[in-house]
UniProtKB/Swiss-Prot annotation:
The keyword Acetylation applies. The disulfide bond which can form in the large chain dimeric partners within the hexadecamer appears to be associated with oxidative stress and protein turnover. The lineage of its organism: Eukaryota, Viridiplantae, Streptophyta, Embryophyta, Tracheophyta. The modification N6,N6,N6-trimethyllysine is found at residue 14. SUPFAM superfamilies: RuBisCo, C-terminal domain (SSF51649), RuBisCO, large subunit, small (N-terminal) domain (SSF54966). GO terms for biological process: photorespiration; reductive pentose-phosphate cycle. Substrate binds at residues 123, 173, 177, 295, 327, 379. Residues 1-2 form a propeptide. The gene is rbcL. This is Ribulose bisphosphate carboxylase large chain. The record marks 334 as: Transition state stabilizer. The active site is at 175 (proton acceptor), 294 (proton acceptor). GO terms for molecular function: magnesium ion binding; monooxygenase activity; ribulose-bisphosphate carboxylase activity.
Length: 477
């Protein structure tokens, strides 16, 4: 036996594989105020006990690996390891469990959503011992929240910038989303803003294509904004999509938007990435730009109930990374979104403090301390008949965004904007008078039609358009 071998043997290191639950399943653990807490929906492979599955998640998303390593002795695993501290069976689902995991704060870089997600939703999602794994919720402790800038400005600052209070903001995505020249695109922006909308928007896949380069679009949209502001006396905006192939190009586009004096830019935060998004959010705060966030790609991640990441987690991550608006679904439109679930993460976007409420899918109490709030954006398959429900569901601190529901008006873009603005003001007035929007919504819209031929025409076009499909992602019974 060589001297080296004798030395290793004398250390007493015992190589091999041991069950994760021996180290990482700790039901006696008392969580700390500084821990990041996670709720995972775990579906183990046949024959894998839930305790072992939960412990494997804790291990593989923190300090563990598939075998014992001698370098474990060079650090304090008890200080740094994740711990599965509770497991609940999911009622009504076969072989599904909610595993609660606590992570010490020292595992994560300050102010980095990228680093947090790399650990918590990293390689563990491909672990063979699990048939499926979904991150349902995270509790971000105040100590970690305070390391983030968050939204560039927040809800109150945005209202002050726009000088608009007491109602939801009104927007429109320019359609067709691809193919228009920059000049025709700017014309549509002008017509919608002149008709009464607060914002118009680039679609998420409008970047800088051969038919419309970004600089041309920015120039024509800025001209449209200033012309509409002059004619209406209201502050207007267009979400100029700064998303690009590199962070440097993205910031270059944001700089040009600032030089034009426009109020807001836009980013696709999931396809663009959290590092790029946080960089843009910091630039926007430093330079007085509002930041609209689109969630393109989210349904690839969040739609399936047993695997992926729930949107409430992606919403929390966005509030930390930074954005003043984010698309949140509509409940009543063409996109996925159950009412209770949607209102749960809408509160997580807007409110300073949100209590645990499993009836809305909120697994943990969340204290955002002083982090500014984010306006939810209801967009996707909505029209004037939806206005009472949208106003009742989302309240004043929201953006209601009608793309086809504006540009599909039979008389053109400006009349479509007029119809939406009048429908919104009728609903806000009725609500302020004490009327029940949920029960009297259709009647309120019909009454308003008497004063607006534009609204009457819109109501006639979309009177039979509904999207009656059951939601895929629903609350557990």
């Amino acid at each position: 036996m060589s001297p080296q071998t004798e030395t290793k043997a004398s250390v007493g290191f015992k190589a091999g594989v041991k069950e994760y639950k021996l180290t990482y399943y700790t039901p006696e653990y008392q969580t700390k105020d500084t821990d990041i807490l996670a709720a995972f929906r775990v579906t183990p492979q046949p024959g894998v006990p839930p305790e072992e599955a939960g412990a494997a998640v804790a291990a593989e998303s923190s300090t563990g690996t598939w075998t014992t390593v001698w370098t474990d002795g060079l650090t304090s695993l008890d200080r740094y390891k994740g711990r599965c501290y509770r497991i609940e069976r999911v009622v009504g689902e076969k072989d599904q469990y909610i595993a609660y995991v606590a992570y010490p704060l020292d595992l994560f870089e300050e102010g980095s959503v990228t680093n947090m997600f790399t650990s918590i939703v990293g390689n563990v999602f491909g672990f063979k011992a699990l048939r499926a794994l979904r991150l349902e919720d995270l509790r971000i402790p105040p100590a970690y929240v305070k390391t983030f800038q968050g939204p560039p400005h927040g809800i109150q600052v945005e209202r002050d910038k726009l000088n608009k209070y007491g109602r939801p903001l009104l927007g429109c995505t320019i359609k067709p989303k691809l193919g228009l020249s920059a000049k025709n695109y700017g014309r549509a922006v002008y017509e919608c803003l002149r008709g009464g909308l607060d914002f118009t928007k680039d679609d998420e896949n409008v970047n800088s294509q051969p038919f419309m380069r970004w600089r041309d679009r920015f120039l024509f949209c800025a001209e449209a904004i200033y012309k509409a502001q002059t004619e209406t006396g209201e502050i207007k905006g267009h979400y100029l999509n700064a998303t690009a192939g590199t962070c440097e190009e993205m910031i270059k586009r944001a700089v040009f938007a600032r030089e034009l004096g426009v109020p807001i830019v836009m980013h696709d935060y999931l396809t663009g990435g959290f590092t790029a998004n946080t960089s843009l959010a910091h630039y926007c705060r430093d330079n007085g730009l509002l930041l609209h966030i689109h969630r393109a790609m989210h349904a690839v991640i969040d739609r399936q109930k047993n695997h992926g990441i729930h949107f409430r987690v992606l919403a929390k991550a966005l509030r930390m990374s930074g954005g003043d608006h984010i698309h949140s679904g509509t409940v009543v439109g063409k996109l996925e979104g159950e009412r209770d679930i949607t209102l749960g993460f809408v509160d997580l976007l807007r409110d300073d403090f949100v209590e645990q409420d499993r009836s809305r899918g909120i697994y943990f109490t969340q204290d955002w301390v002083s982090l500014p709030g984010v306006l939810p954006v209801a967009s996707g398959g909505i029209h004037v008949w939806h206005m009472p429900a949208l106003t009742e569901i989302f309240g004043d601190d929201s953006v209601l965004q009608f793309g086809g529901g504006t540009l599909g008006h039979p008389w053109g873009n400006a009349p479509g904007a007029v119809a939406n603005r009048l429908a919104l003001e009728a609903c806000v007035q009725a609500r302020n008078e004490g009327r029940d929007l949920a029960q009297e919504g259709n009647e309120i819209i019909r009454e308003a039609c008497k004063w607006s031929p534009e609204l009457a025409a819109a109501c006639q076009v979309w009177k039979e358009i509904v999207f009656n499909f059951a939601a895929v992602d629903v609350l557990d019974k």
